[in-house]
Swiss-Prot record:
Its main location: cytoplasm. The gene is gpsA. NADPH binds at S14, Y15, H35, K109, A142, R258, V282, E284. It catalyses: sn-glycerol 3-phosphate + NAD(+) = dihydroxyacetone phosphate + NADH + H(+); sn-glycerol 3-phosphate + NADP(+) = dihydroxyacetone phosphate + NADPH + H(+). It comes from Shewanella piezotolerans (strain WP3 / JCM 13877). Coiled coil: none annotated. The keyword NAD applies. This is Glycerol-3-phosphate dehydrogenase [NAD(P)+].
């Protein structure tokens, strides 16, 4: 079957729309599917995602589409950009409609709820082994990407040709630099753990701690990410790149980050429900914290920052008490395995 579009993007939120804008601005006919027909109709009429990216026009090569079958028939390249807790559901809806030559890439950051499984495991469970898989990850705020500001990401996958094709599709000399990476596991994990550490950074700043504490938290958060990554077969070097250190620094230090703002609100005294309402969009790190905590416990990996964030979010611990417990931990060598 011939493509009538170069790529189909599933998920018309802020990040899905931003990636679709970048692809279309790069000269690629791009279908953007969303599950709410009214939202898609608004995109068509407004030529803009007024709800999530107001003021940024949609390129002519970006075609909003509310019918999933039509969207999936248009291209064999499918980019999934939905929250991690609905990733499996969206894939299950898509499965009977996928072309036989379909290739699936996702920009979803997180793990499977409750189990802490990697997104690749969810994809394989739903789709089987028939389709090439890939993931893109890195330090990206949707608004900046959509506005054409310089951005860099990494891509890894199960099929070298698919990875190479994605680099060609996404890379733009003017707006988006794309690095190929061979660590499929590491790229998936980085996007989940950084959300947890970003909440921790927000908590720290919300309490009133300064730049010293935030920097220490980011640094030790990177250690936790690397420790967990190595335990599941990732390469430590990956976490010094875009999907590790890059995403971690971005998300922990800039208030465009929902996870950081969520932590700030909690640190200033809001409860979890009020903080989520204040943000007004999905805070991936809330669920990611439980997912990462579950995975770390299952593997016996020590992640003290993650554990304290988990206790604040799910066990009612005060941010101040969590900070005190981190500071009063047993003295250790910086380079120890714990």
């Amino acid at each position: 079957m011939e493509n009538t579009a170069d790529i189909t993007v599933l998920g018309a939120g802020s990040y899905g729309t931003a990636l679709a804008i970048s692809l279309a601005s790069n000269g690629h006919r791009t279908l953007l599917w969303g599950h709410e027909p009214e939202h898609i109709e608004n995109l068509k009429n407004d030529k803009c995602n007024q709800e999530f990216l107001p003021g940024i026009p949609l390129p002519d090569l970006l075609i909003p589409e509310s019918d999933l079958a039509t969207a999936l028939a248009a291209s064999n390249n499918v980019l999934v950009v939905v929250p991690s807790h609905v990733f499996g559901l969206v894939l299950a809806q898509a499965k009977p409609l996928l072309r036989k030559d379909a290739r699936i890439v996702w920009a979803t950051k997180g793990l499977e709820p409750e189990t802490g499984r990697l997104i690749q495991d969810v994809a394989r469970e739903v789709l089987g082994e028939a389709f090439p898989l890939a993931v893109l990850s890195g330090p990206t705020f949707a608004k900046e990407l959509a506005a054409g500001m310089p951005t860099a990401i990494s891509i890894a996958g199960t099929d070298p040709q698919f990875t190479s094709d994605l680099v060609e599709l996404l890379h733009s000399p003017k707006r988006l630099r794309v690095y190929a990476n061979d660590d499929f596991i590491g790229l998936q994990l980085g996007g989940a753990v950084k959300n947890v550490i970003a909440i921790g950074a927000g908590l720290s700043d919300g309490i009133g701690f300064g730049a010293n504490a935030r920097t220490a938290l980011i640094t030790r958060g990177l250690v936790e990410l690397t420790r967990l990554g190595e335990a599941i077969g990732a390469q430590a070097s990956t976490f010094m790149g875009m999907a590790g250190l890059g995403d971690l620094v971005l998300t922990c230090t800039d208030n465009q980050s929902r996870n950081r703002r969520f932590g700030l609100a909690l640190g200033k005294g809001s409860d979890v429900e009020a903080a989520q309402i204040e943000i007004g969009q999905v805070v991936e790190g809330y669920r990611n914290t439980k997912e990462v905590y579950t995975l770390a416990k299952r593997l016996g990996v020590e992640m003290p920052i993650t554990e304290q964030v988990y206790q604040v979010l799910y066990q009612g611990k005060s941010p101040v008490d969590a900070a005190k417990e981190l500071l009063s931990r047993e003295k250790k060598s910086e380079t120890s395995a714990e």
